[in-house]
């Protein structure tokens, strides 16, 4: 059992191996040590169990949770802050990013509505530090009609993040008509290409796992 999974079980969050089994995967894929001083944002507070799990595992870090339910303020404690607002509100997301960002780790465990997931990513990924991580949890809702989902349906979170795979390989997209001498020079491409707007150049990798998507910032 991983340390994170053990802590998750103690707090009763559904991220543990007793339910979704995300925490074992996080210890494998997240590039952080327990003693790192991280700035963490989690979308979706619910009963506060996940926030407490992050706090106890990353014990030197500051945790921010956001939720639309005002009752979630009760889960504030040392090194845990809770702000009330919607992940589908650009002004709210901008304000919390200015107040608390940039972030080392963002976890979207919010409404799981596909439009909300895509919207939050577009608003918040710019506020992830270089080398930081953005996680989308419970991405299986991309296939469920009640969450605006469907198999191969355009604009679901799964289809949105699939499309970003091309952006991970932006060198090929931007360099197809340039001298090959520059093919391995990402800094040159970023500084000199006139086609930067055609794709994101800030995504290092995207990992699709069972139930979660992990995006690493370049």
What is the predicted function of each stretch?
Residues 1-107, 111-136, 140-218:
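A short alpha-helical cap/connector motif
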């Amino acid at each position: 059992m991983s340390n994170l999974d053990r802590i998750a079980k103690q707090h009763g969050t559904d991220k543990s191996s007793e339910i979704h089994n995300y925490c074992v995967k996080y210890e494998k894929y997240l590039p952080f040590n327990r003693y790192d001083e991280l700035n963490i944002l989690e979308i979706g507070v619910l009963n506060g169990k996940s926030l407490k799990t992050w706090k106890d595992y990353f014990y030197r870090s500051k945790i921010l949770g956001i939720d639309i339910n005002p009752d979630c303020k009760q889960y504030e404690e040392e090194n845990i802050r809770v702000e009330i607002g919607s992940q589908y509100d650009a002004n709210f997301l901008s304000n919390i990013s200015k107040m608390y960002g940039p972030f080392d780790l963002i976890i979207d465990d919010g409404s799981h509505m596909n439009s909300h997931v895509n919207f939050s990513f577009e608003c918040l990924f710019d506020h992830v530090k270089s080398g930081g991580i953005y996680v989308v949890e419970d991405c299986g809702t991309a296939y469920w009609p009640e969450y605006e989902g469907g198999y191969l349906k355009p604009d679901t979170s799964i289809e949105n993040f699939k499309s970003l795979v091309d952006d991970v390989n932006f060198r090929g997209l931007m360099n197809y008509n340039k001298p090959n001498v520059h093919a391995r020079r990402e800094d040159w491409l970023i500084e000199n290409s006139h086609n930067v707007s055609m794709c994101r150049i800030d995504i290092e990798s995207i990992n699709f796992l069972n139930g979660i998507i992990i995006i690493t910032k370049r």
